[in-house]
């Protein structure tokens, strides 16, 4: 019944199929063929009574992927289609797990803080979502849902960081996440370029073991230099990398 992007008018489909089922069954005495709306139970029952399979189910031993439904017709394009959306789903999944971890250490954390992001990431596991085989307007909607869910989780993340990190300020700090790193943009870090104000940023490792890696932080071009220190005041190795973009440099550092 229907096919991709075609099964939209259910009533029309059922009206037409009802007529076909009725006609097939009216001449079943001559043709030996009957028709009905079946279920998975009907299918399994029919397969079990099929003489060709009662002796044993066929065993597939070669590769399943890439799938092909005809000569030289491999279903492999979706491995790389819509890479930006694939990356967005992956980074949002990482964000979700990190927020879950931090909320576990936060008293009275809202139970629904991550629900919108969880629901959005659940929807994009559909085989026509993360694969990138959806219509463009649907891809936009998936990204919008993830963005809304991530923004909701960011509020809980900021509250969790304020609880876990010591602060001398009487007012809570509003922590902002660099959510546009894929296009080398981080508004919080670039906004303080050219000022003497220090920039504090939190780096969270959600893994079960310590890791050392290089982090890239976009900064503005107006400042001559930066010094990166850890919470104890120890300087971290860092270098300024020029960017072709008009307002951005990269500040990679080891942490």
Model-found features: residue ranges?
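Catalytic-domain carbohydrate-binding cleft regions of carbohydrate-active enzymes
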Residues: 1-193, 198-200, 206, 225, ...
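Surface-exposed beta-strand/loop patches in extracellular or lumenal glycoproteins
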Residues: 207-224
């Amino acid at each position: 019944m229907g096919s991709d992007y075609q099964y939209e008018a259910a009533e029309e489909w059922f009206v037409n199929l009802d007529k076909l089922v009725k006609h097939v069954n009216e001449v079943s005495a001559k043709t030996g063929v009957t028709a009905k709306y079946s279920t998975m139970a009907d299918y399994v029952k029919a397969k079990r009574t099929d003489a060709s399979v009662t002796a044993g189910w066929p065993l597939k031993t070669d590769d399943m992927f890439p799938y092909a439904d005809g000569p030289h017709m491999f279903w492999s394009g979706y491995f790389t289609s819509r890479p930006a959306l694939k990356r967005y789903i992956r980074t949002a999944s990482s964000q979700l797990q990190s927020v879950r971890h931090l909320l576990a250490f936060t008293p009275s954390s809202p139970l629904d803080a991550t629900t919108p992001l969880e629901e959005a990431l659940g929807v994009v596991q559909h085989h026509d979502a993360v694969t990138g085989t959806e219509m463009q307007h649907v891809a936009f909607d998936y990204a919008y849902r993830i963005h809304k869910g991530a923004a909701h989780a960011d509020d809980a993340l900021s509250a969790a960081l304020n609880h876990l990190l010591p602060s001398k300020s009487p007012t809570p700090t509003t922590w902002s996440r660099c959510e546009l790193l894929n296009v080398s943009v981080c508004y919080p870090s670039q906004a303080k370029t050219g000022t003497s104000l220090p920039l504090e940023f939190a780096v969270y490792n959600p893994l079960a073991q310590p890791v050392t890696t290089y982090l890239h932080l976009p900064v503005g071009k107006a400042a001559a230099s930066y010094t990166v220190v850890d919470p104890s005041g120890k300087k971290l190795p860092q270098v300024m990398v020029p960017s072709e973009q008009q307002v951005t440099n990269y500040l990679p550092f080891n942490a």
